[in-house]
Each structure stands twice: as C-alpha cells, then as structure tokens.
C-alpha cells in the first residue's frame, strides 16, 4: 500500500516523534517542534497541516476535541469537504460514519482530490508500538497567528480512563436526582475500571461538569460495555 507519514507537532516534542518512528507501518515522521504549536491553537496547527497536506491524497486525524477543532479549518484551507468521524474504510474514497447520534450508519464517497478525514479511533485496532524504523524529518515552518493567543487552561485530573477511549463506561442521568447521588457511581466505576459519563439532562441540572457529557452534544464513546 501507500506510505504512511505522521506529523508530530508541539513544543519540546522531539522525543515523541522518535517514539512514533518506531510504530509499525510508519514510513516517515515530520516533527514540528516550536512554541507556536505548544497549545494546539487551531489557527496555527491547521495552517501547518494544510501546508503539508496539499501534497497528499489523504489527511487524517483522530476525531478528538483537538481534531474536531482544527481539521475543519484544514479542509477549508484546502477547499475540500471533510469526512468526519469515520468508523470503517470501504475503499480509498468511500467510508462509513455514524449519523443521527449513532442510530444509522452512512456510507459516504468523497470525490475531492485530497480527502480530509477525522477518525473515531476506538473503531480501529491500534498498530504495534514497535517494529518500525521510520525516518524523522524536522519541519522548520512556523505558523503563529497574530489573531489568537493562549491564555490558560484548566486540567481536570482523574485516575479513571478517558471517556472517549474507555473500554467500560458507566453513565448516569436525571434519575440520579442530585450531585450527591451521582457520586454513588464512583464505587462501581472503581471496581470496573470504568469511566463515568452523564446525560445532557444531568449536566444541565448541575449534577456533574459538562466534560462528563456523552452523546451527540457531548463526547463520543465506543466502549465494549456501557452501563
């Protein structure tokens, strides 16, 4: 098949690029190590990806919060339509993706010369972390938009797995009645090694913060077990 090239962008990310180079199936790694990419501001990352992506047939990123932020901008810069959140590849131009909050699966075909795609990572098996020996090429191009600047971030720490990658998810809704009752799920989740999610109703009621919301207006999950 065609070669797979991977872009690693960030600040002080050279070690990550070297680690990615050992992944099976990777032919080349581009390393864009610059403070401009340190906080993944969409304006900066999208310009970088579009500049590199114009020479490729497919530009792919995970359908994470970050990917959903910058990839539509990449598609706009390349003047193509994005194919979002795919769960299967039928051919080089045809893909399957969920629609209507996962109640139906659409098969979509892209006629664009460059396919800009976001992938639901939990729908695909991970490649082996070792077995490859890709070359690493440093990217000197710096895209640093004057229209945005990083102000700060608030990181929520948790020993539980991330919702979007968890194999087991236990979720609560309006029936939990209040935030104190919602905490009853903690013990079950700890026993199962599960992530905890919540419905929009529970979030709107103030039982839990909105980063726990799952579904069409929240985080997309694909666990092996959903309770």
Segments (PLM) and residue ranges:
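N-terminal glycine-rich FAD/FM-binding segment characteristic of electron-transfer flavoproteins
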Residues: 1-226
């Amino acid at each position: 098949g065609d070669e797979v090239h991977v872009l690693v962008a960030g600040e002080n990310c050279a070690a990550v690029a070297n680690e990615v180079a050992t992944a099976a199936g990777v032919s080349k790694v581009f390393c864009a190590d610059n403070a401009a990419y340190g906080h993944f501001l969409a304006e900066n990352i999208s310009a970088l990806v579009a500049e590199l992506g114009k020479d490729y047939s497919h530009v792919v990123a995970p359908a994470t919060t970050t990917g959903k932020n910058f990839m539509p901008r990449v598609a706009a810069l390349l003047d193509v339509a994005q194919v979002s959140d795919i769960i299967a590849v039928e051919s080089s131009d045809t893909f399957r993706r969920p629609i209507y909050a996962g109640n139906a699966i659409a098969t979509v075909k892209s006629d664009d010369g460059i396919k800009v795609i976001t992938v639901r990572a939990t729908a695909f098996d991970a490649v082996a972390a070792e077995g490859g020996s890709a070359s690493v090429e440093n990217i000197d191009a710096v895209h640093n938009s004057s229209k945005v600047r990083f102000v700060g971030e608030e990181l929520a720490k948790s020993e539980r797995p991330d919702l979007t990658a968890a194999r087991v998810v236990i979720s609560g809704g309006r029936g939990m009645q209040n935030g104190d009752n919602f905490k009853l799920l903690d013990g079950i989740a700890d026993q199962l090694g599960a992530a905890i999610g919540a419905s929009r109703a529970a979030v709107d009621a103030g039982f839990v913060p909105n980063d726990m919301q799952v579904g069409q207006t929240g985080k997309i999950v694909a666990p092996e077990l959903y309770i």
